[in-house]
Amino acid sequence: MKSEIINRIASLRNFMRKHKLSAFIIPSTDPHSGEYIPKHWEARKWISGFTGSAGTVVVTLDKAGLWTDSRYFLQAAEQLENTGITLFKERLPETPSIVEWLGCVLNAEDNVGIDGWVNSYQETSNLQKELEKKQIHLTLAPDPFNELWTDRPALPDNKVFIHELKYAGLSCKDKITQIREAIRRNSCTGILISALDEVAWTLNLRGSDVHCNPVFVSYLLITEYSSTLYIIENKLSDEVKDYLTENEIKVRPYSTIEKDLKDFTGKLLLSANINAAVHAAACAHSLIEIAPSPVLFLKAIKNETEIEGFHRAMKRDGVAMVKFLRWLKAAVSTGNETEISIDKKLYEFRAGQPHFNGISFDTIAGYKAHGAIVHYEAIPETDIPLKPEGMLLLDSGAQYLDGTTDITRTIVLGALTKEEKTDYTLVLKGFIQLSMAQFPHGTCGTQLDALARLPMWKAGINYLHGTGHGVGCFLNVHEGPHQFRMNHMPALLVPGMTVTNEPGIYKTGRHGVRTENTMLIVPSQETEFGTYYKFEPLTLCPIDKEAILTDMLSDEEITWFNQYHEKVYNCLNPELNNEEREWLKEVTSPLKR
């Protein structure tokens, strides 16, 4: 394999010489800026042999490097050995950025190539500005891997299916009407939608082209008077074709998007995440308005049907979680279970629920020190057995036809240290404080993020990830525009939005703690000072009481905790057998000092 990588890099260098390029940048992205990448666009993996989910390869005529984050330092070091590719560890003070490195190894007036189809317009613009400061030019080059990658996987061609109105709550025609109103407000004559979850939401269609995300590879062009779906046509059954015709949606081949955009005249609304090649094509004869996609906001506010679906999906997911937790507490003493095996068992419990449609992201099952790796993914090389001691951090989720779930529980498997209990309780305090928040209209997630962090800040502890994100409805588990983050996120929090609440503490080499619910923003009250909102928990699953130091909790926090557990029991117990019901009754019994 190592010799193959060396040969692949050599073939890329020949391509670069042919196109007068001194360097080529290969990211871990696709034309639609997706979180998960279809195999057709896994060029970074092919050229380097590095199989991690995040990383960027840069190849010059005599050097090569891979930039990746701390999750993959060990894996990358092993996989890159003897390939001629140097590992650059991101976010370490001694590690140069890609631009800094290129500034050192290239000469003035050299050309750096990228494939515009897999680099966003925004990222390309920023990269171009930074390189120009070093008198280096950025060039949109042809995709070299169409030529070099001889057994490249085809574009995904899985069948698309209709997401029924009983789940969607709003028809495709009504959604397009809303989008056209937004286009007019932006003084535009059309919009190109490239984010796959936005296309799926607009058309009330779903697919299976992307791991964990029920979406399909496509573009959607909506103008004042027409709508055109760009897609590989054999993905469409006769039923879906008839559905599109009924909704006045034209169908064009996926490969014709560039030509059609070059012919488009008018003013086109594009998101900054549009890929650079599409942006360049649209600029041929059109005026361009770069602005957030209106679909992002429309999709984020769930309608009543979607909210009802979320409640049903969360109940089913809660039943699966209770069955799993009860099984796990007993199974851990056998010594036969590992991080990977318990993930498979959780999948079985979820798959037994109606309307299950796969997981919503790759499960994070981190035992003891592995829990401190924020985005840990157990693989055979890292998998470890569970013992009746310490804690297991389990972050998981599922796709159901009527909702998407995302939940984290830190599970006590046996004896804990005082430090572990303290950290667990600090996280719980932050989690409860944000859960209890009431806030006025006009509030954004940044203003509330600190509520979850304050208990930890008082102890001199912090976490570096965001506290929460939006959740799609049988769509992507991570969606915007709203988030809880320390850096400013201007999107306002309004009723109908779903959002996660997931503070954590991570101590390298020791343990990790995170507790997460998905919540719904709902009206709270009207006062002389305005309209106020609050959070309603959607997730229904017990929170482990065994690690809680009750003296650290306020009376108000204990009251919230007990009320939440009462809700969990009341909602789930009718769906359980007698043994499961008794177990749930015990683990949700009132917390006392």
Predicted regions and their residues:
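Active-site neighborhoods and metal-handling regions in enzymes and metal-associated proteins
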Residues: 1-593
